[in-house]
Structure formats: structure tokens, C-alpha cells
Amino acid sequence: MSACACSHHHAHHDCGRPDPVGAQVALSGEITCADMGQLMALLTHVEAHVAASRAEPGCLFFEIAQTDDPLVWRVEELFRDAAALEAHRARTKTSSWAAATSGIPRQIREIMAQGDVVPAG
């Protein structure tokens, strides 16, 4: 990753996320801001969201990083199991991150250890 003019780090590919093994579940994808307003909402909340997510007991890897396009952010997550992912979703559902970024489109897929890929919901 490289720092951009706004001093954030840009993501390339999987941001170093390990492949899931056993019962682990990974999420991979992008958040695409439509305009500077959405970008500012994301920038305001992303650091706290990443820190809170990384502090969750079932979180093994969590990265949201800006790509070369300042409006597009790479998302890579890895959780111990499906229950840990559900706990993460429950926490974020009522978070300031969710409130501030709910209108920003996400293209996220769920990756199981067996290589199955399904749309994340």
C-alpha cells in the first residue's frame, strides 16, 4: 500500500488478508463513494470502524484501504467463523459507521474455506 495526498493508504488486491481455513469466513470487495460527500462521511468514520472491528474477539484480519481511485476503497476481512461474522454484523448495524455510510454502495463477497464464494448479505 502507498500513502496518497490525503495521507491514507491505498489498497492493492487483498491487502494481505490470508485465505480462510477451517471454519473461517472472509469478506472481500469494495466500497464505492459516489461523490465527495460520501467520501468525507467514510473518511470521518473509517478509522474508528476499523479499530472497533479489529478489537472484536472473532476478527482475525480487517482492512479498509483507499485504492488508486480516491472514491473506491478495498475491503478485506477475516473472521474466526460464521458466528464471529454475525457478531460483527450485529455490532456494526447500530454503529455510527453504519449510520454515516449506509448510502454508500458496497460490492462485498463472502469466501468460505472450501473456496465457495457467495454474495455477502
Task: Describe the residue ranges of each PLM region.
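Short, surface-exposed ligand-recognition loops at beta-strand->loop->(often short) alpha-helix junctions
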Residues: T32-L42
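Glycine-rich beta-strand-turn "strand-cap" elements at beta-sheet edges
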Residues: S2-V25, I64-L71, W97-G121
